[in-house]
Amino acid sequence: AFVEKVYIPDLLAVASFYKDWAAIGAGVGNYMSYGEFQNDNVSNTTNCWLPAGYIKNKDLSKVLPVDQKKVTEDVAHAWYKYSGGDDKALHPYDGETNPNYTGPKPPYEFLDTNKKYTWVKGIRYDGLSTEVGPLSRMLIAYASGHKRIKEVVGMVLQKLGVGPAALFSTLGRTAARGIETLVTAEMLPVWIAELDATIKGGDLRIHNNEKWDPSTWPKEAKGYGFHEAPRGALGHWVVIKDGKVANYQCVVPGGWNSSPRDAKGQRGPFEAALIDTPIKDPNKPLEILRTIHSFDPCMACAIHVVDSDWSEIIKVRVV
């Protein structure tokens, strides 16, 4: 009720005063979703309530299938080093995470973007900088013919008096989060009823344990798992040898969206979305925050720091 009676009306009311932002903050124009809320087997991402897919160059007439083999990580502008050279991107199965800070000594005010300037790797799909998150999910569902999402997107566009092109913007990104919240909330009673019926039917399984026992594993194995976190596409890749983890890489939503430039000079979604943003007061660049906030950024999610001895790394005290 809150989403329908408060969130969406407030979203539309505020957005109506910022319709110029329907032409600002577009970003890279490439969008991906791994799919979420599977309709049958949890491993079947081709049959999801929120469909999987890839939209290239804002082309809503064609939704491409997602192929995990096309995901790579680039460190040309990130503070890491690859054993085979920093100019070649690696697939997560072959991924390396070797910290190599070459930036200025803190504290500093500026970073040279022609060099390495971030701890975030340059994540790419088929060599392309790609946005993930609510906007990507809603665009792919809309372009895939999802009935309810097409209805709600159409309603929002009509009430704001803008066309589908407005979706590729800061305003569109913000609206997509509200649209997704509404349609997902509408489905909750359905899913809860399904869960209730399943439990009453005696099915209490919470996971697939067919390959849970390490003794059943081959000498060498590889696997990956996809999930749509609220912020976007989340992927885990693992390589197992002799029953032990030989390599593991986690490619997270914050990494996709906050990616730096790659070896080819392609900007990541954050950077690309800020191009041509009008700034009223350079001393108070609220417009920059407006676009970055539309991605719901989380740098603590993009980069994880873990001590191998499980010692405390840093303590932050908020007073």
Give a label for each model feature.
Residues 1-231, 242, 247, 252-319:
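Active-site bordering "gate/hinge" segments
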Residues 234-239:
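C-terminal, well-structured subdomains that either form a transmembrane helix-short loop-helix hairpin
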